[in-house]
């Protein structure tokens, strides 16, 4: 497996792998510095959309991944999401992905957030998966933390295999195939 470069990412985006796509790095908006997004040397920095689901314990339910209670979240739409101390929120990428059959995509958090105690987690994007990426933001601090919509939040790394997989995510009817918006756990 080899990591793919900015040139490869731009070509793949022209074929529809990432929409919308930013071919360079964006670091300012309206004259103000932002958390960067767009194509980097060996990755693509995704943006957080303005839809969030913020975890709450007001309903005192048990978190069960097999029978997840949607009442565990409060829906929020806005430019800035404030995550309560030691809590988390779900969001999604602005970008919609269509991963090629020979590619596995790994997501890593941005250091700007990590250095503030905000951790981004995303499981790998498997071959032939497509959809908006659901982002998990954990606020590991004892203070409220901000996440900015429309700005960079995580970096995707594209690894291409020297052999195409026998069975892709699409082939096996993956439960998150084609997801749009913030998607809760499914079994």
Curated annotation (Swiss-Prot):
Catalytic residues in the record: 136
Subunit text: Homotrimer.
Gene: dcd
Binding positions for dCTP per the UniProt entry: 110-115, 134-136, 155, 169, 179
Chain's role: Catalyzes the deamination of dCTP to dUTP.
Family recorded in the similarity comment: Belongs to the dCTP deaminase family.
Gene3D superfamilies referenced in this protein's UniProt entry, alphabetically: 2.70.40.10
An example Gene Ontology biological process: dUMP biosynthetic process
Name the record gives this protein: dCTP deaminase
Catalytic activity: dCTP + H2O + H(+) = dUTP + NH4(+)
Alphabetical list of CDD domains matching this protein: trimeric_dUTPase
Cross-referenced HAMAP family: dCTP_deaminase (MF_00146)
Species of the source: Bordetella pertussis (strain Tohama I / ATCC BAA-589 / NCTC 13251)
EC number(s) on file: 3.5.4.13
Pathway: Pyrimidine metabolism; dUMP biosynthesis; dUMP from dCTP (dUTP route): step 1/2
One Gene Ontology molecular-function label: dCTP deaminase activity
Record keywords, A-Z: Hydrolase, Nucleotide metabolism, Nucleotide-binding
């Amino acid at each position: 497996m080899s990591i793919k470069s900015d040139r490869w990412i731009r070509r793949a985006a022209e074929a529809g792998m990432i929409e919308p796509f930013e071919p360079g790095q964006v670091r300012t908006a309206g004259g103000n510095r932002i958390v960067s997004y767009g194509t980097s040397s060996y990755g693509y920095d995704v943006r957080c959309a303005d839809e969030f689901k913020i975890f709450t314990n007001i309903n005192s339910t048990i978190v069960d991944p097999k029978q997840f209670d949607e009442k565990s979240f409060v829906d929020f739409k806005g430019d800035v999401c404030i995550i309560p101390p030691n809590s988390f929120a779900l969001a999604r990428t602005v970008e919609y992905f269509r991963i090629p059959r020979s590619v596995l995509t790994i997501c890593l958090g941005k250091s700007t957030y990590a250095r503030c105690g905000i951790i981004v987690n995303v499981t790998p994007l498997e071959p032939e998966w497509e959809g908006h990426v659901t982002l998990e933001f954990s606020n590991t601090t004892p203070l409220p933390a901000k996440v900015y919509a429309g700005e960079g939040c995580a970096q995707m790394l594209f690894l291409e295999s020297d052999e195409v997989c026998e069975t892709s995510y699409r082939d096996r009817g993956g439960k998150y195939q084609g997801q749009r918006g913030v998607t809760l756990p499914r079994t």
